[in-house]
């Protein structure tokens, strides 16, 4: 059916989507991605194409590509593909200078949050956030990112906290 529709109109989105799904079922994910890619690159794809494309990319382990594609997509596509988006973690309290010890909390729609407190860029080998962090006297440079259940990373946040206990 897809081939007949494509013979008449090679740019038919529904027919290309059907062809890609057929290729995926037969185990040819690479070809399925190649069929859908022009729609994504030309920004002409509807939400169905985006959903199938990011699903295939995720299955192929290309999660960074998923993140970049959805970051630049319009709101309708982002909403349709929300399960593939990992929002950046939120820190509380806000960065700044404080005169008392602070309890830092990180939250997000992530399965895990990785962080560093020395200003270095976190990796998946960094500490995993499991409980609030006590910020004591001195300067703390937090960097953190989240990973969702689809293994897609968020952007890295960077926050600076200065604790001065004996402030005049």
Predicted feature locations:
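Residues at alpha-helix boundaries and short interhelical turns
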Residues: 9-10, 43
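Short, compositionally stereotyped local motifs that mark structural "simplifiers"
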Residues: 17-18, 22-37, 41-43, 47-168
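Alpha-helical adaptor scaffolds
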Residues: 2-7, 13-25
């Amino acid at each position: 059916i897809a081939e007949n529709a494509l013979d008449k109109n090679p740019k038919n989105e529904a027919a290309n989507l059907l062809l890609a799904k057929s290729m995926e079922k037969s185990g040819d994910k690479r070809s399925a991605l190649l069929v859908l890619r022009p729609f994504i690159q030309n920004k002409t794809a509807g939400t169905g194409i985006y959903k199938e494309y990011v699903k295939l990319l995720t299955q192929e382990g290309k999660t960074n590509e998923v993140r970049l594609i959805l970051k630049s997509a319009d709101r309708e596509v982002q909403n349709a593909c929300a399960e593939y988006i990992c929002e950046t973690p939120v820190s509380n309290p806000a960065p700044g200078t404080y005169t008392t010890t602070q309890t830092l909390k990180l939250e997000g729609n992530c399965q895990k949050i990785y962080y560093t407190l020395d200003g270095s860029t976190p990796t998946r080998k960094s500490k995993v956030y499991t409980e609030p962090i006590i910020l004591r006297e001195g300067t703390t440079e937090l960097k953190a990112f989240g990973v969702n259940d689809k293994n897609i990373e968020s952007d890295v946040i960077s926050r600076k906290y200065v604790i001065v206990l004996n402030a005049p």
